[in-house]
Amino acid sequence: MTFNNKTIEELHNLLVSKEISATELTQATLEDIKSREEALNSFVTIAEEQALVQAKAIDEAGIDADNVLSGIPLAVKDNISTDGILTTAASKMLYNYEPIFDATAVANAKTKGMIVVGKTNMDEFAMGGSGETSHYGATKNAWDHSKVPGGSSSGSAAAVASGQVRLSLGSDTGGSIRQPAAFNGIVGLKPTYGTVSRFGLIAFGSSLDQIGPFAPTVKENALLLNAIASEDAKDSTSAPVRIADFTSKIGQDIKGMKIALPKEYLGEGINPEVKETILNAAKHFEKLGAIVEEVSLPHSKYGVAVYYIIASSEASSNLQRFDGIRYGYRAEDATNLDEIYVNSRSQGFGEEVKRRIMLGTFSLSSGYYDAYYKKAGQVRTLIIQDFEKVFADYDLILGPTAPSVAYDLDSLNHDPVAMYLADLLTIPVNLAGLPGISIPAGFSQGLPVGLQLIGPKYSEETIYQAAAAFEATTDYHKQQPVIFGGDN
């Protein structure tokens, strides 16, 4: 028995009416995970024992009829701490790390009665855009197993797209929720920086990281954000939740909404079919009553360079804690303290992680700080100001999520710059701390194309409103890959 084609609200009704139990739903979800796992490699850990214990406790306490997420399974990216469940960040360095606490986002989800069924595969320490840098092997795209699923939240996206789970959590530092959502044809949101606590998230770029939700539909995505968003004293950068219900505007029309279409987002390097899909989406928004006009974000072209200086610099600092002494991998061939440090880190980290540590260390080094890190911070300010100018006159920004559809596995592994450029359209959103969503907008070569909507800070409910209006009048989100049971 499978329930993966039922929405969260449909599942809730079945649970409340006792047509199914939380244990039965969890068991069915675990079977969906296992039956697809060999093809996808989307999980690092399947937490069967812990999930069934949680489900039994919820059944004994009774489903909360007023809480739509009570008894619903949840997959969690492997860089988000889960009490008693391995949390490896898909790295050899943390191959045996089992936290003794839940990340705040996970704790919030559990408080709502959600059941953690496993930890999803990812690029190592969230460093990568293809899902291929994991110590545990590459995740496959749900639509075509010869293609990348995007990254770094590769497993979280593939798991939802393939029907392994209905909901999952990812993290987004430069596009790591939105790009895999686009490549797998689902809905992924990066919230405003500070909306979801980073406590318990294994840090990559602390001024950029944000936990966010994956789901098949816009409303289900918003329901999960409702569950995980909170101010948190354990995260000094968390902000008060300004929206009581992120679904509040879903279903409202968008007549008169002003949407900006940056010319830079449809320029050089954008696949022609992706460009055509986004222009058609813009026309669709106009048919729904929105006003779509071209604007300019002149400094967005510097986003990738700025990001890789700032993110790598922050990573080089954050990853200093992995030294082979306190926890995680320790080299066995070391004979003194220096060798423990050097050998453990050189053997425990993968090539992409070491590349970024080197870049960040160089950018922060004496004599180069002003030329690189300081200048990157100054250009980041210009990118923020570009967005502020546009949002003075417009409600949202529209564009593609990625310059292309999913590409072949192992096709860009030896060209890191080309892979970095795949995040060209998502990175500026992180640099500015803004919310952004990717929703399905069409297909090219049989693969999903993602549309990105960006809003000013704390405008998630408006983003969901526009995304839901598009979704309600198209059927791209209804199409499913073969592994789920679709025709594609």
From Swiss-Prot:
Function: Allows the formation of correctly charged Gln-tRNA(Gln) through the transamidation of misacylated Glu-tRNA(Gln) in organisms which lack glutaminyl-tRNA synthetase. The reaction takes place in the presence of glutamine and ATP through an activated gamma-phospho-Glu-tRNA(Gln).
An example molecular function term from Gene Ontology annotations: glutaminyl-tRNA synthase (glutamine-hydrolyzing) activity
GO CC, any one term: glutamyl-tRNA(Gln) amidotransferase complex
Record bears the keyword Ligase: yes
Assembly mode: Heterotrimer of A, B and C subunits.
This protein's encoding gene: gatA
Keywords: ATP-binding, Ligase, Nucleotide-binding, Protein biosynthesis
One of the GO BP terms on file: translation
Identification of the protein by name: Glutamyl-tRNA(Gln) amidotransferase subunit A
